[in-house]
């Protein structure tokens, strides 16, 4: 009787998307045909019931690869209408919104397209006006690529450093809350290593058989995994370029501009190329993906994030090409505006998915090694 009462109480507190994931997982747990596709299904088999914490954990463990959708005998148009990618995607959006900091800003996830647009317009206007205010004009004689003659170094360091740290801090505050609810135990070094390997290699975008995901149909492709790698490692190379340039400036006394074949410029150039190839490929795949695959309402968030990354790299490469011309001020203001828009939307856009997924991968590494000892905080 107590067990029945517990199930009734949990059913009342589940949202509609969470209740759908619970229904889908109950069917999948009875079938288990997809058990070898990814981490979601082995994690599912360790449960007979699916509470709120379990559902949010499994939803963020899902990589939206689509293999289970095309393999499922109960997928639409079957009357069971089992669509794991769609159900999981809808819960992921609720996860981001629920754990957003401050809480009121969680609503921005549901208007992600508008959020990205407003952030971009605001940032572009801000830096164009700053450039005009500091130099009196957007056009100027060539400055030999010296950005700091347009915007002082300390101003840029303060603006971008504070916004980036605040954005990451707000995002991490939500991820920590999420972690505490899905995992009552902390990780061990071996579990951290396994989760890191799975995240960095995107292991679960291989479809479980190494041939890749499904996109427009039931054909397998590794393109999504590869474009994700171009995007992630391109971003990390750009970040490394910033770190090296910061070290040059503060510790070695070497001030920008740096030659083309210097370490910061080469890292930034290679990263920029990765951030063109990767996002362009992901956008192409997003446009051709099956309508049954994922949550169509989230396409503005997905595409807005991809376009911001693409604009960041394109404007950065354009700035490098035009840094010795009288157009450098305009190019610099546009590039900085795009980067600022990206930073502003970090805690309220698609950027968050990587953090929540890594937390879920870590939970799975713990669970796989320790079984029921890993538990769920809500149990």
Curated annotation (Swiss-Prot):
Keywords (alphabetical) are: 4Fe-4S, Citrate utilization, Iron, Iron-sulfur, Metal-binding, Plasmid, Transposable element
A GO term, aspect molecular function: 4 iron, 4 sulfur cluster binding
Keyword match Metal-binding: yes
- Cite the binding residues for [4Fe-4S] cluster 2: 38, 62, 65, 68
Residues holding [4Fe-4S] cluster 1: 28, 31, 34, 72
Please provide the Gene Ontology terms (biological process) for this protein.
Answer: citrate metabolic process
Keyword 4Fe-4S tagged = yes
What InterPro entries does the record tag this protein with?
Answer: Citrate_utilization_prot_B (IPR012830), NarG-like_sf (IPR036197)
Cystine connections = none
Q: Spell out the NCBIfam families in the cross-references.
A: CitB (TIGR02484), PRK15033.1 (NF011607)
Full protein name: Citrate utilization protein B
This chain's source organism reads: Escherichia coli
């Amino acid at each position: 009787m107590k067990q029945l009462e517990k199930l009734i109480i949990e059913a009342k507190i589940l949202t509609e998307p969470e209740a759908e994931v619970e229904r889908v997982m109950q069917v999948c747990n009875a079938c288990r045909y997809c058990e070898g596709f990814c981490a979601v299904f082995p994690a599912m088999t360790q449960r007979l019931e699916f509470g709120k914490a379990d559902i949010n954990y499994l939803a963020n463990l899902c990589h939206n690869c689509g293999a289970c959708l095309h393999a499922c005998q109960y997928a639409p148009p079957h009357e069971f209408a089992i669509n794991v990618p769609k159900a999981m995607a809808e819960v992921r959006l609720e996860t981001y919104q629920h754990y957003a900091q401050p809480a009121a800003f969680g609503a921005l996830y549901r208007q992600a397209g508008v959020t990205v647009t407003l952030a971009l317009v605001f940032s572009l206007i801000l830096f164009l006006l700053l450039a005009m205010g500091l130099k009196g004009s957007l056009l100027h004689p060539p400055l030999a690529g010296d950005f700091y003659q347009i915007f002082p170094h300390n101003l840029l360091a303060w603006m971008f450093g504070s916004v980036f740290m605040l954005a990451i801090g707000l995002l991490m505050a939500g991820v920590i809350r999420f972690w505490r609810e899905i995992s009552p135990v902390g990780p061990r070094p071996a579990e951290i290593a396994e989760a890191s390997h799975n995240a960095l290699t995107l292991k679960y975008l291989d479809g479980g058989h190494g041939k890749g995901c499904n996109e427009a149909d039931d054909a397998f492709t590794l393109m999504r995994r590869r474009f994700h790698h171009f995007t992630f490692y391109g971003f990390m190379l750009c970040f490394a370029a910033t770190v090296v340039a910061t070290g040059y400036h503060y510790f070695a006394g070497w001030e920008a501009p740096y030659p083309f074949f210097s370490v910061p410029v080469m890292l930034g150039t290679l990263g920029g190329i990765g951030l063109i190839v990767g996002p362009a490929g992901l956008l192409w795949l997003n446009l051709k993906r099956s309508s049954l695959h994922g949550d169509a309402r989230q396409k503005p968030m997905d595409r807005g994030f991809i376009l911001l990354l693409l604009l960041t790299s394109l404007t950065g490469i354009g700035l490098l090409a035009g840094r010795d011309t009288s157009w450098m001020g305009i190019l610099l203001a546009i590039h900085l505006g795009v980067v600022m828009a990206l930073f502003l939307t970090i805690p309220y856009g698609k950027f968050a998915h990587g953090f929540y997924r890594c937390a879920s991968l870590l939970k799975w590494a713990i669970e796989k090694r320790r079984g029921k000892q890993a538990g769920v905080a809500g149990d």
